[in-house]
A protein has these predicted regions:
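Solvent-exposed beta-strand/loop surfaces of large extracellular or lumenal domains
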Residues: 188-207, 312-342
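Catalytic-domain carbohydrate-binding cleft regions of carbohydrate-active enzymes
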Residues: 1-209, 214-215
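Residue-identity detector for threonine
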Residues: 23, 30, 43, 66, ...
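Accessory, solvent-exposed terminal regions and/or long lumenal/extracellular loops of proteins
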Residues: 214-316, 324-325, 337-354, 359-368
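A generic structural signal for short, solvent-exposed coil/turn residues
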Residues: 1-2, 44, 131-133, 156, ...
Length: 368
């Protein structure tokens, strides 16, 4: 394909290599130590100007990984810019995602989660191409005024808004996590449980657990339709996880993923400006000529204090459903989840600039 963008991975390079190629951590040895220390290698490369870095998942040299080690390595690898499972094991085995039958579902779920993150990851790659911001970021990249962030080497930010603290110890039942100061954090695995930043917590883990925390102020884009490839499939059901705080701007970027047509304006860049307060308003503004593939939008907005009073789309009130069953059956509407303390809103993509407003204002109980 003469129009295709080149893709290059190289073993070595010098300052400026990020303009031409991805790099990787070298031929690592299969061990828990390699899994752990590949993280600061990747984040260190990010601080050195190379935003796209990855490691050989499962280890390149040495024996085949144990089942537990391989699961944990895949769970880490899904956040790397370059996610590659391959090996030249010394025991004549080949490392494959399906090599352990009992853990195949856990490994599959982790890989599918990466594909669900495609809108978020591709937008982060766009940001990297414009600013050099790493895909896997050392905590100190965003939290330079927090002394403890300077000391943390084995947690990282996936893009701007998701803190990841992979399980890195054999047989672990808990994971100690430092949450940087300056904002609140919401536990991805515990119904968005809220933690104040600037503290160390301990969370329980199983083999399936990937400790992740949503940063206050985040808008995280996911695909609710399960993507299976990064270039052939497109997001048709967009899912936005929102943790309102102040005024924030999030950019979603999309193009065909293959050609250089984006250079002539064939791309789609959507800027989401979220303003928090008694009314939370999300303004969506798009540019570019690339066809919008999104058919439906679901907004999952963390709202720990109370349920909204009303929700509008471009000033038109959206129907409120009191039961999950009726909400799930509807094409449009909103529902407040008591278990998560989050409001869910869904609607057909207007295919134009639009505004979604969620009101948490006080209201007249008698007058309503």
């Amino acid at each position: 394909n003469a129009k295709a963008r080149p893709y290059m991975v190289c073993r070595s390079g010098s300052a400026g290599i990020q303009r031409y190629a991805q790099t990787w951590c070298g031929d690592n040895y299969t061990s828990w130590k390699s899994l752990k220390y590949n993280i600061p290698i990747i984040t260190g490369m990010g601080l050195s100007g190379q935003p796209n870095e990855g490691a050989d998942i499962g280890g390149f040299a040495g024996p085949a990984p144990t089942e537990e080690l391989f699961v944990r390595w895949v769970q880490n690898g899904i956040f790397q810019a370059r996610f590659s499972i391959h090996s030249a094991s010394n025991d004549n085995t080949v490392t494959e995602p399906w090599m352990f039958r009992e853990s195949a579902d856990t490994i599959r779920d982790a890989i599918l989660l990466r594909y669900r993150f495609t809108p978020y990851l591709y937008s982060a790659e766009y940001e990297a191409s414009q600013t050099g911001a790493p895909i896997m970021r050392a905590l100190v990249y965003d939290f330079q005024n927090d002394p403890k962030a300077w000391e943390e080497s084995f947690e990282f930010l996936f893009g701007r808004d998701i803190l990841v603290a992979n399980v890195l110890e054999e047989g672990a039942k808990t994971r100690t996590v430092y949450l940087p100061a300056g904002c609140k954090w919401y536990d991805w695995n515990d119904k968005f449980r809220c933690y104040e930043g600037g503290q160390t917590i301990e969370v329980p883990v199983t083999m399936a657990t990937i400790p992740m925390f949503v940063r206050e102020g985040a808008v995280i884009a996911m695909a609710d339709n399960q993507l299976m490839t990064m270039e052939g499939d497109h997001t048709t059901a967009l899912h936005l996880i929102v943790a309102p705080k102040g005024t924030t701007t999030t950019t979603l970027y999309d193009d065909d993923g293959i050609t250089n047509d984006f250079k002539s304006g064939v791309y789609r860049k959507t800027t989401i400006t979220t303003t928090a307060g008694e009314r939370v308003t999300m303004n969506f503004a798009s540019e570019g000529s690339y066809k919008d593939t999104v058919e439906t939008i679901k907004v999952e907005m963390i709202a720990k204090e109370k349920s909204p009073f009303w929700v509008t789309l471009d000033g038109r009130k959206i129907e409120h459903f009191l039961t999950r069953r009726k909400f799930d059956a509807a094409a449009e509407g909103w529902y407040y989840s008591q278990s998560k303390k989050a409001v869910e809103v869904k609607y057909a993509n207007p295919a134009k600039n639009h505004a979604l407003t969620v009101s948490f204002e006080q209201f007249d109980l008698i007058g309503m």
